[in-house]
Amino acid sequence: MLPLPSCSLPILLLFLLPSVPIESQPPPSTLPPFLAPEWDLLSPRVVLSRGAPAGPPLLFLLEAGAFRESAGAPANRSRRGVSETAPASRRGELAVCDAVSGWVTDRRTAVDLRGREVEVLGEVPAAGGSPLRQYFFETRCKADNAEEGGPGAGGGGCRGVDRRHWVSECKAKQSYVRALTADAQGRVGWRWIRIDTACVCTLLSRTGRA
């Protein structure tokens, strides 16, 4: 007579099956993670950091000629500020409009690509660490002490323009940069917002005015 199969065999096979680990899911974050492709859309004028940047963006210094030292002269960048980026051979040149640049550390609102006002979030979530803050390097027209603004200052006429034939004014020019924002409905996402990036001269012919 053949022996009956043991009833413990199914239990033994159950313990021999490979176990599948169950990973705990992290709680959903209220802010979206910073995806890798977004880094390609970030402007040099935007920095995500836990502390305010110590100096201007490198690209800004290169465009301004801060690293073009005269031949044979020792480099002395310790005293070079944002307003002193012109090469030594061009010290006699004057800008049509005076501009001042610096990091904006307390931006709260901005206008997006659709012309709507959005809230600029103060913190950006970072994996495995404390959140980052958003800093914007903006360039604006330099204010003048005079009430109406002097030549080259914001709100004043452009330097070197013949006032007999032209009406000129120095105005801030804006560009779009990527930033983490929230709209009026509370929807959080990366949007294009406008920030001041230059001070330009606008002209209006006096002969064409009424």
UniProtKB/Swiss-Prot annotation:
GO molecular function: growth factor activity; nerve growth factor receptor binding
Localization, UniProt: Secreted
Carbohydrate-modified residues: N76
Propeptide feature: residues: 25-80
Homology family: Belongs to the NGF-beta family.
Presence of the UniProt keyword Iron-sulfur in the record: no
Tissue specificity note: Highest levels in prostate, lower levels in thymus, placenta, and skeletal muscle. Expressed in embryonic and adult tissues.
Intrachain S-S bonds: C97-C170, C141-C199, C158-C201
Extent of the signal sequence: 1-24
Gene symbol of the encoding locus: NTF4
Entry-linked InterPro entries: Cystine-knot_cytokine (IPR029034), Nerve_growth_factor-like (IPR020408), Nerve_growth_factor-rel (IPR002072), Nerve_growth_factor_CS (IPR019846), Neurotrophin-4 (IPR020432)
Phenotype for E84K: In GLC1O; uncertain significance
Disease: Glaucoma 1, open angle, O: A form of primary open angle glaucoma (POAG). POAG is characterized by a specific pattern of optic nerve and visual field defects. The angle of the anterior chamber of the eye is open, and usually the intraocular pressure is increased. However, glaucoma can occur at any intraocular pressure. The disease is generally asymptomatic until the late stages, by which time significant and irreversible optic nerve damage has already taken place.
GO BP of this protein: adult locomotory behavior; ameloblast differentiation; cell surface receptor protein tyrosine kinase signaling pathway; epidermis development; ganglion mother cell fate determination; innervation; long-term memory; mechanoreceptor differentiation
Gene Ontology terms: cellular component: axon; dendrite; extracellular region; extracellular space; synaptic vesicle
Keyword set, alphabetical order: Cleavage on pair of basic residues, Disulfide bond, Glaucoma, Glycoprotein, Growth factor, Secreted, Signal
Protein name, UniProt field: Neurotrophin-4
